[in-house]
Regions:
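Acidic, metal-associated active-site segment
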Residues: 72-81
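A glycine-rich helix N-cap at a beta->alpha junction
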Residues: 36-45, 103-125
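Glycine-rich phosphate- or other oxyanion-binding loops that anchor nucleotides, phosphorylated ligands
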Residues: 97
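Short secondary-structure boundary segments
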Residues: 49, 92, 118
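C-terminal helix-cap and adjacent tail motif
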Residues: 59, 112-143
């Protein structure tokens, strides 16, 4: 990831977002009980946010913490992919169990876990990653 991108992210999004980089084998093994989405990646990034510190839209009170954390997570994934690494966003996990394993996450809403590593040569994405709706079903042109 470029230094400029890191600096930009830290100024904009990392005010309320935190990233935990997990590489300890025992901890990675323990985290397997938190989700079914485990693929043996040597690095797991856990992304969390603090809604109490986030920007809130004044019109309806919409809190931007999760959106900001998702932006950070997306940038992390794009940067890793740019370095030739594979990533997998995991949203299906039990935050309470993860917090038991990583007490340092206390006080944060846990948004995502991201597996990072080199892809296995035989790996292929599931159908849900290649099947697409027609553009007309996704985009409405307003004229």
């Amino acid at each position: 990831m470029s230094k400029q991108l890191c600096e930009k992210m830290s100024k904009i999004y990392l005010l309320i977002t935190h990233i935990w980089a997990v590489t300890n084998l025992e901890t990675l093994e323990a985290i397997k009980g938190v989700t079914r989405s485990n693929y043996g990646a040597p690095l797991l990034l856990v992304v969390g946010c603090r809604p109490a510190e986030a920007w809130v839209r004044r019109y309806d009170g919409k809190n931007g913490a999760e959106v900001d954390a998702a932006i950070v997570a997306t940038y992390l994934m794009l940067a890793a992919e740019n370095e030739g690494l594979a990533t997998l966003w995991v949203g299906s996990f039990d935050p309470a169990l993860l917090r038991d394993i990583l007490p340092c996450t206390e006080g944060y809403d846990l948004v995502a876990m991201i597996n990072v590593g080199y892809p296995a040569p035989e790996s292929t994405p599931s159908a849900m990653h290649s099947e697409r709706k027609a553009v007309e079903e996704l985009v409405t042109r307003v004229v």
